[in-house]
């Protein structure tokens, strides 16, 4: 595939350590539409359960020092999806691994990535999800951000500025709990909620939403946000 395209290398539900190619400007409000990244991409099946995905991502204005090569191998072993990811830049290297599976009625996942180069750090996410009341879903994820700081006073004086400017890290602390749930109350009504807890400074973010379709042309949406 040649041209602008969506590119996701992550597998965690909320924060994926290997999703580092950002096709939008972090300084502006995030929007539903994201234009994609300019890339040359090759995908090939290696059988019924395996494939390789590799390519080149163009940096700003095609600058070689800001461009990157990537490779990803995906397979399935005894019902568990496995993925190994490699990203190479002139100044950085990322090696990642992810596993997704199930235990009974619960979904399980784990993903980790090691960045080395001018800055070195680990990032990892592990989580579980499941269903309730026929139409409801819930999830719980723990995230470790090795690029962050445990001391609040150092949030804006981080030792890993490139993690935020190049690799799309946006959380400032190191340890987080993320949870969420959603439910379809009827064919036209749904609710959802998500919470993020910072275990280092005990701050938190909570959001909830309500959606109801009144007709093909009209709908009602309401949201609630809280930072503590």
Where are these regions (language model features)?
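Residues that define the transmembrane beta-barrel architecture of outer-membrane proteins
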Residues: 34-38, 65-69, 76-78, 91-95, ...
């Amino acid at each position: 595939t040649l041209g602008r395209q969506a590119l996701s290398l992550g597998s965690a539900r909320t924060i994926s350590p290997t999703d580092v190619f950002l096709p939008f400007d972090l300084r502006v409000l995030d929007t539903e539409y994201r234009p994609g990244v300019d890339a040359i991409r090759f995908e090939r099946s290696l059988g019924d359960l395996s494939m390789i995905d590799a390519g080149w991502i163009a940096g700003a204005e095609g600058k070689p020092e800001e461009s990157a090569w990537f490779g990803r191998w995906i397979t399935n072993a005894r019902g568990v999806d496995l993925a190994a990811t490699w990203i190479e830049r002139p100044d950085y290297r990322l090696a990642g691994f992810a596993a997704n599976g199930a235990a009974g009625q619960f979904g399980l996942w784990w993903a980790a990535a090691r960045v080395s180069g001018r800055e070195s750090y680990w990032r990892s996410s592990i989580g579980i999800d499941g269903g309730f009341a026929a139409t409801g879903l819930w999830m719980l994820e723990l995230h470790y951000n090795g690029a962050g700081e445990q001391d609040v006073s150092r949030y804006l004086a981080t030792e890993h500025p490139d993690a935020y400017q190049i690799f799309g890290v946006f959380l400032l602390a190191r340890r987080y709990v993320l949870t969420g749930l959603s439910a379809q109350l009827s064919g036209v009504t749904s609710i959802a909620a998500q919470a993020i807890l910072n275990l280092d400074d005990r701050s938190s973010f909570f959001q909830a939403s309500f959606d109801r379709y009144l007709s093909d042309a009209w709908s009602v949406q309401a949201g609630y946000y809280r930072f503590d």
